[in-house]
């Protein structure tokens, strides 16, 4: 006698059919169009991804003001460690406030001070709630909680269905476990710590059977700018866990040491990135710089999408996903985003990913079958110049492996920058918002204009504490 389908099976089947019928949600397309229409004409360029690929990012505030590090650069205020955390429901309300602007599969940073200092059950509840809103939460952390508390990451993965994590590692941090990490003065000296995180993340995924997209962040100062070279070499040197890095030139905000902020330009940062990826070849480095894209104002962020090719016996090689605008294949990438902007595979199972791909093909068979094969052939030729069939055979045999890598820079502003003409233009085009008292506020305003400090002061008063209260109760 045939068995009846379980409710779970029926839900999965409905999900597959839904994705096949609508591979890009109408809500996502509407948000993209709204954001594109709101851009000034001079920012509607081929490099512009806002309103084309995505709809920006949101972050929580008050999730855990406390941090157990004492970094040289920090956006938190002096009183942060004496401020009580927001209740879980208040953070959930922030997520609801962000959802209309982020859309389905919207990027949400679960952040504040060090969120992993909250009770695990509360972090898990926040992760679960974000998923219920169709947001994709990325847990922002220094990572040492995972080193000190075995099993914590595994709980987040299995009970909270954590799918994205970002671990901050650089020489500006103070408070690491391990003497070698505490006394490191160069970024290269922290590469063993980065290796440790790779192993930790690999083990957690193997133990739980859950996949985790991992990013790493690095604060960039005048002191460690040259260390970008060592971090990039490590990143492409063979590790297979971190597929995104965010470089953040330091701003003079919060409790950052006086005079420590500023002094690192985007041009200086990106030249070091491109020079490392190109092996010092100036022409190749310049070509990589021409492959950058951005969201909103180009002074706020820069992004380079690519893949790293690993071939036995050869040095790893980075290839930009979107060729420079002069390349004939750049038009294929641009057309893909025009047709399928807003498409997201981030929360897909294998079945829904296949259904989504078929759904895209059914909507534009001429493009998918007519142009994408040529683009794929172009990629094979890049992987093995003059011998694309050999590249295909090597991919099939495993002699050639490829891994995606996204390189990002986020350029937050100090208070003096916010008052300039460009600063005002950047605020008007901000793509990174925090919900504060019912209003979405630019992260730069939150950190540089005292918004965070005032928010924390309100939290303290609501909890019956003063900002200068030193009682342990305020840490809860």
Regions found by a protein language model. Give the residues of each.
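Flexible glycine/acidic-rich beta-alpha junction loops that bind and position SAM and/or redox cofactors
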Residues: 173-181, 242-268, 284-311
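Short loop/turn segments at strand-loop or loop-helix junctions that form parts
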Residues: 63-64, 75-76, 167-173, 247-250, ...
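Radical SAM enzyme core and accessory elements
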Residues: 1-49, 309-476
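Rossmann-like AdoMet/SAM-dependent catalytic core
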Residues: 268-274, 278, 286-340
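Radical SAM/AdoMet-radical enzyme domain recognition
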Residues: 95-96, 100-110, 119-248
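Conserved alpha-helical substructure of the radical SAM core
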Residues: 10-151, 155
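Short, solvent-exposed loop/turn segments at secondary-structure junctions
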Residues: 68, 172, 221-223, 250-252, ...
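Alpha-helix N-cap and loop-to-helix initiation/capping positions
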Residues: 83-90, 182-192, 261-265
């Amino acid at each position: 006698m045939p068995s009846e389908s379980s409710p779970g099976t029926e839900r999965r089947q409905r999900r597959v059919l839904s994705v096949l019928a609508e591979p890009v949600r109408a809500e996502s397309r509407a948000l993209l169009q709204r954001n594109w229409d709101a851009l000034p004409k001079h920012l509607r360029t081929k490099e512009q991804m806002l309103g084309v690929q995505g709809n920006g990012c949101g972050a929580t505030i008050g999730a855990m003001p406390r941090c157990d590090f004492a970094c040289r650069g920090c956006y938190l205020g002096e009183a942060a460690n004496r401020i009580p955390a927001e209740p879980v429901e208040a953070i959930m309300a922030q997520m609801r406030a962000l959802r209309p602007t982020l859309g389905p599969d919207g990027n949400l940073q679960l952040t504040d001070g060090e969120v992993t200092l909250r009770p695990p059950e509360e972090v898990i509840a926040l992760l679960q709630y974000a998923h219920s809103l169709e947001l994709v939460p990325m847990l922002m952390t220094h990572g040492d909680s995972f080193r000190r508390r075995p099993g914590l990451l595994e709980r987040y993965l299995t009970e909270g269905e954590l799918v994205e994590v970002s671990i901050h590692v650089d020489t500006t941090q103070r408070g690491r476990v391990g003497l070698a990490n505490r006394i490191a003065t160069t970024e290269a000296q922290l590469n063993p710590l980065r290796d440790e995180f790779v192993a930790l993340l690999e083990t957690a995924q193997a133990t739980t059977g859950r996949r985790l997209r991992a990013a790493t962040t690095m604060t960039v100062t005048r002191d460690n700018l040259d260390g970008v070279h060592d971090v990039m070499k490590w990143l492409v040197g063979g590790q297979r866990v971190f597929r995104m890095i965010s470089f953040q030139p330091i701003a003079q905000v919060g409790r950052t040491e006086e005079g420590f902020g500023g002094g690192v330009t985007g041009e200086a940062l990106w030249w070091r990135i491109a020079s490392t990826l190109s092996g010092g070849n100036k022409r190749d480095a310049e070509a990589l710089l021409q492959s950058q894209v951005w969201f909103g104002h180009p002074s706020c962020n820069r992004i380079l999408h690519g893949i790293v090719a690993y071939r036995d016996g050869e040095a790893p090689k980075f290839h930009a996903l979107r060729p420079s605008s002069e390349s004939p294949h750049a038009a294929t990438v641009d057309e893909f985003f025009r047709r399928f902007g807003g498409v997201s595979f981030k929360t897909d199972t294998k079945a829904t990913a296949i259904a989504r791909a078929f759904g895209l093909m059914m909507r534009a068979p001429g493009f998918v079958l007519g142009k994408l094969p040529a683009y794929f052939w172009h990629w094979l030729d890049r992987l093995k110049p003059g011998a694309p069939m050999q590249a295909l055979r090597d991919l099939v045999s495993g002699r050639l492996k490829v891994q995606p890598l996204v390189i990002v820079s986020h350029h937050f502003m100090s208070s003096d920058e916010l008052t300039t003409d460009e600063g005002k233009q950047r605020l008007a085009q901000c793509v990174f918002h925090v919900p504060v008292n019912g209003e979405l506020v630019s992260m730069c305003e939150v950190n540089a204009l005292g918004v965070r400090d005032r928010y924390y002061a309100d939290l303290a008063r609501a909890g019956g504490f003063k900002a200068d209260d030193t009682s342990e109760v305020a840490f809860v």
